[in-house]
A protein has these predicted regions:
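Exported/periplasmic cell-wall-interacting domains
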Residues: 1-153
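C-terminal non-catalytic accessory extensions
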Residues: 157-180
Length: 180
């Protein structure tokens, strides 16, 4: 890649789809999201598109963007309100994380790993919120509480079944055991 495109969790709605793109087909991935704005990241029109060339966007062949675009279009026709994009640097397995433990981005990638692990465990997109300028995943807050991007996180709870599944996943300890 061009090392300019952001990483994180994004949601695409029908309004972000662009069938008239100069790059064949495209859709705006919704950058900046709440996390990006809380961390003063700016920009706009970060697109996923065809034409296989880009600066700051995610490009792919026309064939691949047509496939993704068709799936999104049909999901929206079927009543789905949005779809999630997980823009990750690599598969966030313990082995891959161990290879990058000295990266300046390791702490950020560890945060993203929680959302990625949820998807791998459940095959469902994680519920994503932001508080204290960080992502939080699959958390429920008490009635009357809410997440705020720049303030302290409210008390949260993870559903018991999910907490049990997370307790059995390869963790940070597994990553440290792989570091040579």
């Amino acid at each position: 890649g061009d090392r300019q495109a952001p990483e994180g969790f994004y949601h695409v709605t029908p309004a972000l789809m662009n069938p008239n793109s100069s790059y064949h087909l495209s859709f705006n991935m919704g950058f900046p999201n709440a996390y990006d704005r809380a961390n003063d990241r700016t920009g706009s029109f970060l697109m996923i598109h065809g034409a296989c060339s880009s600066a700051g966007c995610y490009s792919m062949t026309d064939e691949y963007v047509e496939e993704i675009y068709a799936l999104a279009r049909e999901a929206f026709k079927g009543g789905q309100k949005s779809f999630q994009i997980q823009a990750l640097p690599f598969r966030l397995t313990p082995e891959n994380m161990a290879k990058h433990v000295n990266s300046n981005n390791f702490e950020f990638w560890t945060m993203l790993k929680e959302g990625s692990d949820y998807f791998e465990l459940t095959k469902q997109p994680p519920k994503v919120d932001v508080c204290e300028k960080r992502y939080v995943f699959n958390r429920a807050v008490a009635e009357g509480e809410r997440f705020s991007t720049r303030t302290e996180c409210p008390l949260t709870e993870m559903p018991r079944s999910l907490a049990t599944a997370f307790a059995t996943r390869p963790s940070s300890r597994a990553i440290s055991n792989l570091i040579v």
